[in-house]
């Protein structure tokens, strides 16, 4: 199934049903009173998180959704039927954003969680509602209110405990294959991984965590190069980042330079995400002589001025992977205990999570705007020169502003 993590849709709640104007008509009752019923409320639209979904592809081709309209009221004080609510199922981890205001309407992070995105219109009133001591035969009704309408942007972020960072061919997919049952594609060319992959790592019978592998980053990714920048948002909700570095690149490039590229791109994308706990994992140690390990490790650590945990592994030979996964499990358990017992730490992490979300959304929006300008043939706003303006266009200062964009 095709992986889609961003879509734009339009949702329209049902209109409320109109009130009815009716009068009682029975044998021997010549002037019966009003008996027009109210209309039914319009149906609302909800988003529901479904743990069985892992893509938004269903909304790629069907983009307009309308809830049912409420029925009109009837005679004999019959109230119209309420419009049926519409439930749109999305993957767990989906954020719902109002496209017009960029306001985050809600975040669906738990299976079964529901979120109302547009509310159905209120019902209209029948003429029975307007009966009074001075108006015994009212001919007044009200129409139903229109339902809300919104343009929404749905963003899905995979929910994982641990995220993998690295250049293409750093061995991320091989690592996730070696520690979990996931089987992402592995090959000896860059960008083998085109979409995020998830794997469940079982440390023992009762303990496990989820690890996410995203497409590799390259230099300039924060400016739109490669594939990784749009997938970096999937690491926003991870608890720990693993920075994988190839200790023995086939092209004989510098491992310290490669490690530095990832750090720089991460900071450019989101300085707050760079503050997330991160471990350095040096992969493919089986490709170099054992006596060279210490020198290679020191070279990379010194270049990054690294002070955090460092692991030397071989994912394909499964050397050092068991120790790494057990340490990750221990870290996640300690983190959960501290969150439960330390309110200040919990508040600190919540603030960090919010900053990461805001920075990631702003970065991706800026990238989308840049791509839109490229498609229109304009590299930037500054490319529109003075010769592109016509003095006649600015005679009416109160008129609409007209901007010309080169095709």
From Swiss-Prot:
Obg domain location = 1-159
Q: Where is the composition biased (Acidic residues)?
A: 385-400
InterPro entries associated with the record = G_OBG, GTP-bd, GTP-bd_Obg/CgtA, GTP1-OBG_CS, GTP1_OBG_dom, GTP1_OBG_dom_sf, OBG_GTPase, P-loop_NTPase
Q: Which residues form the OBG-type G domain?
A: 160-333
Chain sites annotated for binding GTP: 166-173, 191-195, 213-216, 283-286, 314-316
- Keyword Metal-binding in annotation: yes
GO term, biological process aspect, one: ribosome biogenesis
Q: Where is the composition biased (Polar residues)?
A: 129-143
Needed cofactors, names only, are: Mg(2+)
Q: What is this protein called?
A: GTPase Obg
Native species: Pseudomonas fluorescens (strain Pf0-1)
Record lineage: Bacteria, Pseudomonadati, Pseudomonadota, Gammaproteobacteria, Pseudomonadales
């Amino acid at each position: 199934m095709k992986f889609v993590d961003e879509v734009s849709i339009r949702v329209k709640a049902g209109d409320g049903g109109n009130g009815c104007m009716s009068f009682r008509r029975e044998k021997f009752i010549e002037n019966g009173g009003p008996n027009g019923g109210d209309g039914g409320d319009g149906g609302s639209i909800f988003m529901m998180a479904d743990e069985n979904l892992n893509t938004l592809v269903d909304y790629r081709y069907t983009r307009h959704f309308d809830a049912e309209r409420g029925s009109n009221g009837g005679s004999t004080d019959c109230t119209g039927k309420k419009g049926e609510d519409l439930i749109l199922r999305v993957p767990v981890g989906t954020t719902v954003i109002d496209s017009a205001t960029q306001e985050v309407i809600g975040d669906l992070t738990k299976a079964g969680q529901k979120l109302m995105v547009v509310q159905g219109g209120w019902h209209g009133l029948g003429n029975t509602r307007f009966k009074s001591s001075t108006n015994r035969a009212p001919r007044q009704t009200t129409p139903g209110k229109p339902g809300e309408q919104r343009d929404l942007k749905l963003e899905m972020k995979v929910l994982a405990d641990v995220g993998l960072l690295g250049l293409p061919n750093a061995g991320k997919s091989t690592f996730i294959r070696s520690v979990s049952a996931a089987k992402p594609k592995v090959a000896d060319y860059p960008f083998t991984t085109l979409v995020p992959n998830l794997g469940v790592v079982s440390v023992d019978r009762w303990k496990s965590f989820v690890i996410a592998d995203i497409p590799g980053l390259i230099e300039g990714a924060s400016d739109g190069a490669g594939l990784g920048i749009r997938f970096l948002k999937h690491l926003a909700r991870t608890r720990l980042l693993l920075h994988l570095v190839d200790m023995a690149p086939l092209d004989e490039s510098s491992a310290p330079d490669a490690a530095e590229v990832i750090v720089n791109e991460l900071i450019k994308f989101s300085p707050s995400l760079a503050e997330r706990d991160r471990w350095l994992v040096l992969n493919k140690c089986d490709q170099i002589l054992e006596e060279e390990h210490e020198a290679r490790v020191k070279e990379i650590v010194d270049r990054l001025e690294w002070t955090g945990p460092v692991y030397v592994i071989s994912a394909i030979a499964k050397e050092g992977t068991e120790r790494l996964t057990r340490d990750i499990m221990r870290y996640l358990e300690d983190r959960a205990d501290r969150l439960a017992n330390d309110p200040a730490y919990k508040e600190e992490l919540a603030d960090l999570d919010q900053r990461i979300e805001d920075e990631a959304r702003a970065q991706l929006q800026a990238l989308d705007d840049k791509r839109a300008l490229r498609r229109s043939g304009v590299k930037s706003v500054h490319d529109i020169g003075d010769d592109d303006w016509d003095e006649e266009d600015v005679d009416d200062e109160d008129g609409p502003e007209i901007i010309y964009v080169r095709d």
